[in-house]
């Protein structure tokens, strides 16, 4: 296969030999190092092929013999190139047509979204437009499907998951939205108790009989709203419903190092564009003869398959970015480390109490410096939801 391609690119010619001394001519060609191949005998003539580069040497050898040689065929890239020069207009037109067809085969012509509500789909298309994913855009100049998926998931709140699949000239997206909990059609009778020890700061009862009031100190499991309403003779069971917030306390232990070593990007980036044929990558843009060394380089690659008329080609476009990074040392004084520890502890508490909770204040109970680290014990004053529902259990008379 390799010799076949070499023969094509170097060019070959077919000769027809007639007359006497043909065998001696072929033997002399072998002695002179002139490759002769595809030798065929036809009655009184012999046809054979030689490389284009050996034509002059063959003529010198043939002049010593009485046989005649006639060129009957020419094959290979040099002759195709010669024909294209003679038909330059056709060649340029064909090249432009091929390039346009190739570009059209690698554009996005449709973005298909399934599983999303109209409002969500509108938000998605706006977001896609902002990040450069739109109709008429070349696929290898866009983000990879994985990065599109990550950008959509992070950029649109009401999406739980989105699958992005590029097929031909169409981007298919399957969406799973965040479902709001369905309203309960029927809720069994229940009480509301305190889920932890607290001081009630806010209380709004929609259903049920209040059994506590604002500023009351309540213990864990204490009844706050009863599901039994009405007089003793005519009691009715209902599903208690209320918003009750109380003041609680969280104890947090945090450790902050005084010195931290980490990597940061300097802003220097080297970008290369390549065509990949399997394991072979050929640079097409971004190569510099003056190579500036990048310290602690980190390389990322984006690979895009190329298509032609719906068929995947055995070649890919690769965008390679090499970023320079350097080690940076972050130092804290003891006071700065304490403030950072308070902030980290607050974030941890906020994650536990949810978005409706609120951290009112904090107090550092204990702080020590050991082995280059500040260790803190912090108490946070918090306002949070203390509602916990329990079923109504009535005592049965024996």
Swiss-Prot record:
Q: What is a single Pfam family found in this protein's UniProt entry?
A: YqfD
Q: What residue intervals traverse the membrane?
A: 88-108
Its record classes its membrane topology as:
Single-pass membrane protein
User: Keywords on this record?
Assistant: Cell membrane, Membrane, Sporulation, Transmembrane, Transmembrane helix
GO terms of biological process kind: sporulation resulting in formation of a cellular spore
Q: InterPro entries given for it? A: YqfD
Q: Work out whether the entry's keyword set contains Iron-sulfur.
A: no
Primary residence: membrane
Where does this polypeptide localize?
A: Cell membrane
Q: Which domain of life is it from?
A: Bacteria
- A Gene Ontology cellular-component term: plasma membrane
Q: Which family does it belong to?
A: To B.megaterium SpoIV.
Q: What is this protein called?
A: Uncharacterized protein YqfD
């Amino acid at each position: 296969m390799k010799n076949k391609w070499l023969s094509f690119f170097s060019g070959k010619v077919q000769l027809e030999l007639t007359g006497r001394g043909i065998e001696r001519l072929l033997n002399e060609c072998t002695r002179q190092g002139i490759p002769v191949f595809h030798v065929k005998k036809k009655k009184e003539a012999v046809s054979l092929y030689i490389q284009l580069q050996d034509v002059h040497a063959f003529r010198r050898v043939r002049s010593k013999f009485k046989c005649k040689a006639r060129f009957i065929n020419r094959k290979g890239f040099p002759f195709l190139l010669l024909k294209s020069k003679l038909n330059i207009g056709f060649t340029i037109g064909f090249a432009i047509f091929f390039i346009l067809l190739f570009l059209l085969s690698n554009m996005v012509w449709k973005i298909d979204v399934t599983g999303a509500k109209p409002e969500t789909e509108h938000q998605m298309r706006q977001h896609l437009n902002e990040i450069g994913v739109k109709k008429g855009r070349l696929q290898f100049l866009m983000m990879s499907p994985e990065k599109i998926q990550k950008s959509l998931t992070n950029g649109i709140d009401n999406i739980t998951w989105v699958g992005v699949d590029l097929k031909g000239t169409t981007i298919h997206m399957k969406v799973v939205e965040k479902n709001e909990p369905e309203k309960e059609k029927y809720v069994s009778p229940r009480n509301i108790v305190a889920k932890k020890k607290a001081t009630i700061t806010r209380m709004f009862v929609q259903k049920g009989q209040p059994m506590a009031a604002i500023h009351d100190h309540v213990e864990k499991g204490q009844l706050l709203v009863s599901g039994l309403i009405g007089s003793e003779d005519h009691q009715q069971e209902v599903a208690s419903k209320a918003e009750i917030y109380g003041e609680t306390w969280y104890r947090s232990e945090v450790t902050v190092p005084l010195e931290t070593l980490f990597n940061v990007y300097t802003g220097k980036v080297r970008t290369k564009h390549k065509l990949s044929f399997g394991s072979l990558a050929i640079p097409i843009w971004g190569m510099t003869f003056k190579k500036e060394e990048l310290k602690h380089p980190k390389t990322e690659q984006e690979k895009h398959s190329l298509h032609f008329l719906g068929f995947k080609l055995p070649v890919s476009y690769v965008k390679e970015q090499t970023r320079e990074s350097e080690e940076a040392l972050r130092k804290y004084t003891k006071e700065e480390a304490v403030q950072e520890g308070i902030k980290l502890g607050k974030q941890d508490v906020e994650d536990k109490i949810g978005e409706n909770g609120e951290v009112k204040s904090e107090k550092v109970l204990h702080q020590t410096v050991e082995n280059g680290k500040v260790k803190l014990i912090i108490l946070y004053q918090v306002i949070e939801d203390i509602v916990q529902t329990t079923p109504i259990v009535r005592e049965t008379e024996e």
